[in-house]
Amino acid sequence: MNALFSRNVAALSPSATLAVSAEAARLRREGVNVVDLGAGEPDFPTPKLVAEAGVRATQAGKTKYAANEGILELRAAVARRLSLLSGGRPVNADNIVVSNGAKQSVMNACFCLFGGREKVLIPSPAWTSYPQIVHVARATPVEVAGDPEWSLKVSVDELDREWDESVKGLIMNSPGNPTGAVYTLAELKAIAEWAKRKGVWIVADEIYRRIHYGDGVAPSFLDLPDDLLEQVVLVDGASKAYAMTGWRIGVALAPRELARTMAALQSHTTSGANTMAQWAAAEAFGNDLVQPEVEAMTAAFRLRRDYLVGRFRKELPGVEFVEPMGAFYLFFRVDDVFGKSVPNATEFCRRLIADEALALVPGAAFGDDRWVRLSYAASDEALRDGVDRLVRQFARLASEKADASKQKAG
């Protein structure tokens, strides 16, 4: 630990996903034809009606501080949309807190619920920021390995094996980043029942809920009975479904007292989210004319998913991967080509960008350095070119490994 810094950031490390994008940008500035399939954001523009709402808010002078919990118009629009997505169940706008992105919503929840000498279970592989957020909250993240035979999801049995009296929280993410795995409603119900028995809070990150390749939206904790939601914080936002990553709008739905506490915490950190962005997000969640664009983007992601899965099965038949049922990532194993020169996925990705100018994210960012994440939030041309480069790299590394074995045998 650097003696200049406090214990609050002792275990903190920078985002590996952003580091990949930064390296890709550096190579582009040098004139290299880089294919970047590392980005975790939709490649589509923000819907026109949404962008225009942000402009109107600016022109109308809606540029002052917003309430810490968010403008009522956005909270009401989110409440209505969540209600519609979950079969019309009542959702109260007073239980919603708007933040500067879903990441801040997760952080607000963790800071309000967890602290020193307490543990938070995190199914792994997991989004790179979850354990970092828990560390900054001075709690201890405990990664629970997902089952490779079950799309790297975890069951109650795995959670139970890691539980002790110090476990106070569980962070869930479905559809998942980096795996694209989706928990069924029955699986969510079993986990919620387990958490209730154990007195464990669930922070459910459902930012990818609308990007689902099954029927309708992905199953949600919000689809469960009220008695299973008493210790659940549901996190969502505008970034993924509405292609609004740069607008920085996240939301949390929580029990009333916790929602008030999260808003109070935010009042002492960032204050309310960007006012103009909130008006744009109110249009996104509230205007029914915008929703077909979400469906169109999801349909495009589905076609890309199908293309990737088809090429992997045909051209990389020995490579294990999780078939994504949501989000826009393909997570695949690369340890078959590990050797002296490429001992892990981090080095695999370093070699990949050096040899083929293809940027992917190593699994170390998500807790398992045998895997790599490929984002198909990219153009069809970039995907075709990217897979071509990836296939060449697998062949190159397999040849290097075979040559090394021959030399060792000789």
Per-region residue spans from a language model:
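PLP-dependent class I/II
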Residues: 2-5, 13-35, 41-57, 87-410
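Substrate/cofactor-recognition hotspot
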Residues: 9
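Conserved N-terminal alpha-helix of the aminotransferase class I/II PLP-enzyme fold
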Residues: 65-99
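Generic short alpha-helical segment signal, independent of protein family or function
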Residues: 55-63, 83
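Short gly/ser-rich anion-binding loops that grip negatively charged ligand groups
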Residues: 40, 61-68
